Amino acid sequence: ISPEGQEPLDGSVKTIAQLFKNAGYVTGAFGKWGLGYPGSAAEPNKVGFDKFYGYNCQRQAHSYYPAWLYDNSIKVILPANPYSQDLIHQQALQFIRDNKGKSFFGYFAYSLPHASLEQPDDSILQMYKRKFCEPKAFKYSGNYTGTTIPRTQFAGMVTRLDNYLGEIIIELEK
């Protein structure tokens, strides 16, 4: 089992979050963070982000049904195998709502679309089923989940991301 996280940013590096925070903005990061392992000097909350919710490791972000995500520096065990991108997106929307009327900087690092090609079997995925000529076999190497409908999955993931961005715009315009 590989350790969680990647080599941290050098302490002399200033992040965009630090620049915004120093200018009086509230800052939030949502999604994939791969710039410092848990407990390092480059955790999101230590490099300018007031709020972080997501993966504190790029490798962990290759699974959309992880056993845990991070809420700031706290590892939160996820019950019932929820779809991570929906959880991350809900936290991002809440950050926008919580900071309405304030100057804020949001860093939305969703990992859609990416390996593995997997998502809930909901209306987004359903609208693409039987729309593509799928390859006869599609199997990832390593620990990635294979799928018999990679083009369908990819199209659904792009649409899901597009929906998330639309919801962010709607929330900003309120």
Give the role of each language-model region.
Residues E4, L35, G39-E43, F52, ...:
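Active-site-proximal cap/lid insertion segments
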Residues I1-G28, V47, K51, C57-H62:
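Active-site segment of extracytoplasmic enzymes that catalyze sulfate/phosphate-ester chemistry
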Residues K32:
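Active-site glycine-centered loops adjacent to acidic/histidine catalytic or metal-binding residues
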